[in-house]
């Protein structure tokens, strides 16, 4: 049944309704509602539809000249009338997604304290570590089903932003709703304020976080443990997404909790899933398989290694051995190629290190096995950037790759735009329009000669909303590796280029809600097959997906007793 057709009974009236963003309708309150809820005189005379409100809001939005001001404007609507906010974003998803999330959200995080206006979500400070249960009970959202949590240490490619990192959970949950149909009433952004090592923030009199160096080691681990246990007590079935934790914490936290709670790390697993899905589509478009590709990474942190492990798993599923799959994946960091004799490798890097005996037979120019050396010797067909270092895919690197690969796949994925390893225009110019390009941030189409290329945005928003919707639809208890792999394959099946050999590598953002539902179905099917969710027929699963897919429409309100 469509919930928008049923009335919602409210026990309060007057200005309190206008101050509640989840139920405020603004000028759309009917005459009857204005009388019953003591709103007469508090609103202008005209009663508008949500589309009329959205048209005015879009006109106001268009008057702003820079993206940060547009972001602030949209956040203000979100904080006053969430239904209108999501109608506006749904109507203009391609234009507004870069404003509410990457790349603009990075600037919003940097200026979070200076631009702070109104509370949203929860800030849990280390100094309040003994009162986490009380803080969770203070939330204005009571039926929470999805949490995005960060500690603000590795915000996009911008580093430690302290509590300014709250912009990321807010933005991510906005996409859970805009793209995946998760009701905003069921979402909660959380920042774990464990201090900051950003001296600029510590010295800033406007900084609103806990002025303390970051808590580390066992104190940090105990704090996160207390948080996870408290969340589980408050909302036992909630889905928790870890977001923008530093490399040294991201993988250990994921390994510790992924089999204990329903959780995943979007930087590691979501990025891996969307990248593998994009690579599957690109491989299909080139009439080959992922297992036949040779892949070079620039960036060997938790995100890069997470993608690499997902690629290895997909290659193995296509029939090659694990040893063969790992021999086709090359990880390069700022010191050069990761090898089995490289000092101080992190545990998650060790299995991805190349054999030094093999590398010793290469022709190396210079003192280290640089990215260009790897390109010249490994002769890759795929190049992926997750380094956060702009301009690293130089003309020499791209031309060297194109020299031995007629149709190279190049994914400069670092966010925000200022951190991208190469622009799509440069990559396409250096390969005479032959490269298959996808980026982490949005870019305008590129014209080479008479041909215009749509630039696919290899953005996690194609994956995590569908995962969330699938988890809610089947009430999954965990997020397994197999569920994530299913999301990759489902995304590849939605690729225009992969299915028709024409168009973009990834679907248009206008189709993202359909894609999310398709991914949700695939994810839920695997969860049920693994015994991690309620057993449902395909018909019941589709009904559950539709039931859980919230639409930004106003409901009728009726008065109940105080």
Swiss-Prot record:
GO terms for molecular function: malate dehydrogenase (decarboxylating) (NAD+) activity; metal ion binding; NAD binding; oxaloacetate decarboxylase activity. It holds the Pfam family malic. Its EC number is 1.1.1.38. It is an enzyme of class 1 (oxidoreductase). The active site is at residues 101, 172. The keyword Transferase does not apply. NAD(+) binds at residues 154, 267, 415. One of its GO terms (cellular component) is cytosol. The record marks 267 as: Important for activity. The keyword NAD applies. A divalent metal cation binds at residues 243-244, 267. Keywords: Metal-binding, NAD, Oxidoreductase. InterPro entries: Aminoacid_DH-like_N_sf (IPR046346), Malic_enzyme_CS (IPR015884), Malic_N_dom (IPR012301), Malic_N_dom_sf (IPR037062), Malic_NAD-bd (IPR012302), Malic_OxRdtase (IPR001891), NAD(P)-bd_dom_sf (IPR036291), NAD_malic_enz_proteobac (IPR023667). It catalyses: (S)-malate + NAD(+) = pyruvate + CO2 + NADH; oxaloacetate + H(+) = pyruvate + CO2. Homotetramer. This is NAD-dependent malic enzyme. It comes from Shewanella denitrificans (strain OS217 / ATCC BAA-1090 / DSM 15013).
